[in-house]
Amino acid sequence: MSKQADSLGFEQDAKPENVVWHRHAVDKAQRATLKQQRPAVLWFTGLSGAGKSTVAGALENRLAALGYHTYLLDGDNVRHGLCSDLGFSEQDRRENIRRIGELAKLMSDAGLIVLTAFISPHRAERQMVRDLLPNGEFLEVYVNTSLDVCEARDPKGLYKKARAGEIRQFTGIDSAYEAPLNPDIDLPAGEKSVDELVAQCLQALAERHIIQRWV
């Protein structure tokens, strides 16, 4: 049987068929029942500066106040740990989304309402994550803010650096952003307040029976 060394130096079987799935004694439905909620993944996508983290954070705060069990995965935060080994090449960006998708799936399996805030510029990558989850459990949330508004905000100074050529392949400037064609939730973040956007999200969750109480 062929062997290969992993990153820690341990020998592993090279063939993936030697890895089997271990079934849990407590399943997803039981975890969700204990939490009295329906698991879901809300995937916030949009340009840098669109307001993804702001709206997702405000929504999580509101859901927590209502007694729901949540977790917010933020694009910057995961690059301090889980994805700290990745850069910003197309390949690394895709791997970044793949890892977050798998993590979000595990958190959903734990019965949580998962919120993620990532630019995730390509439709194929967002579809890749949707395909990981049961039908109706992935909600694409488009934080719909124009490039002009995002660039005017420029909270991290990234657009200025991109325009100056200090950052290459920056989404919206010299790298394309593929806006969702039919998002589950379309947030006009350049026109409404954060509170209004949160209310829109809560209503959408209630309509899908993901939450029962939100007023």
Curated annotation (Swiss-Prot):
* InterPro entries assigned to the protein according to its UniProt record, in alphabetical order: APS_kinase (IPR002891), P-loop_NTPase (IPR027417)
Look up the record and name the pathway of this protein: Sulfur metabolism; hydrogen sulfide biosynthesis; sulfite from sulfate: step 2/3
An MF annotation (GO) of this entry? adenylylsulfate kinase activity
As recorded in UniProt, its EC number(s) are 2.7.1.25
Q: Which UniProt keywords apply?
A: ATP-binding, Kinase, Nucleotide-binding, Phosphoprotein, Transferase
Active-site residue list: 120 (phosphoserine intermediate)
Q: Mind telling me which Pfam families this protein's record contains? A: APS_kinase (PF01583)
Write down the top EC class of this protein. Answer: transferase
Query: Where is ATP annotated to bind?
Result: 46-53
Provide the reaction this enzyme catalyses. Answer: adenosine 5'-phosphosulfate + ATP = 3'-phosphoadenylyl sulfate + ADP + H(+)
Look up the record and give one Gene Ontology term from the biological process aspect. sulfate assimilation
Q: Which family does it belong to?
A: Belongs to the APS kinase family.
UniProt function note: Catalyzes the synthesis of activated sulfate.
Q: What is this protein called?
A: Adenylyl-sulfate kinase
Q: What lineage does UniProt assign to this protein's organism?
A: Bacteria, Pseudomonadati, Pseudomonadota, Gammaproteobacteria, Vibrionales
Task: From the UniProt record, report the name of the gene that encodes this protein.
Answer: cysC
